Structures are given as structure tokens and as C-alpha cells.
């Protein structure tokens, strides 16, 4: 979701489905891991503009997406505070009908090493993922896609 408002405004009326990733809420983490300035604020503005243009995700009778926003969020190890703030913002600013894909497939690779980023040098735990899903429901989000999870969710 690190898109400029100018670019998004040029696409108004041309795009049917937006699928932005919202990675981090905390400015320090976004600078550390993404190395981009103002990521959280830019992402919030971009996602609000996408939502203004196409609204909530709508499907046809066969379950095929037709139009709307589907927000993706990758749960990261030791970053549940970010996950909670992002989910709270989605529910509050966009509404509980927003379709959210809460992803668990983070895998440390590449530049993520024990020395450089030890705090994210592991997969997320089942408990971290379950807390993310539970919090999404707690703030009123109900259109959740978490079908790829390999463990049973206890509700």
C-alpha cells in the first residue's frame, strides 16, 4: 500500500479490485524493515483512497470477486502490536465489512539473519496467529480470509 495518492487518483474509475498489503503500523519498524519513509501514513492514505474508489469487496453468485478492496496483512513475529493497530484502524476507519486476508506464511530468508534482525528471525507461533484472528473479531471484522492456516482455529 505504499502508493502515492496522485497515482491512485489517476487510476480512479479504471481499477475494479485493489489488494494492498498493510505491513507495519509502527514508524520505527517500517523504517527498520522496509527502509521507506512514512510507510504507515502513506499506507493509511492509500488504502482509504482505494476504498473510496471501489468500496467493500463484492462477489458474484459463483464467489468471484467483482469490485472492492481486499486488504492483506502478514502477521510478523514479535509484531502483534502492529497487527492489532492495523486491524483496529481497518475496522474503525473503513468499517467492519472490510475484507481482510490475515496471513501467517512469514518465513525469515534473505537479509533476515540472526545478527541483523534477530527479533523477526523465526516463523510466527500458532498463538500469535490465533491472537491476530481473535483480535480482528474483537474489533468487529468478520470478513476474514485465513483459510491457509495449517492449524485448527479453536472456534
Question: Where do the language-model regions lie?
Answer:
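Generic hydrophobic secondary-structure packing signal
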Residues: 39-42, 128, 132
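Flexible loop/N-cap segments at domain edges
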Residues: 122, 127
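A cross-taxonomic marker for long C-terminal extensions/tails that follow the last structured domain
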Residues: 130-155
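Residues lining hydrophobic/aromatic ligand-binding pockets adjacent to catalytic sites
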Residues: 116-119
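Conserved AdoMet/S-adenosylmethionine-binding subsite of the radical SAM
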Residues: 1-114
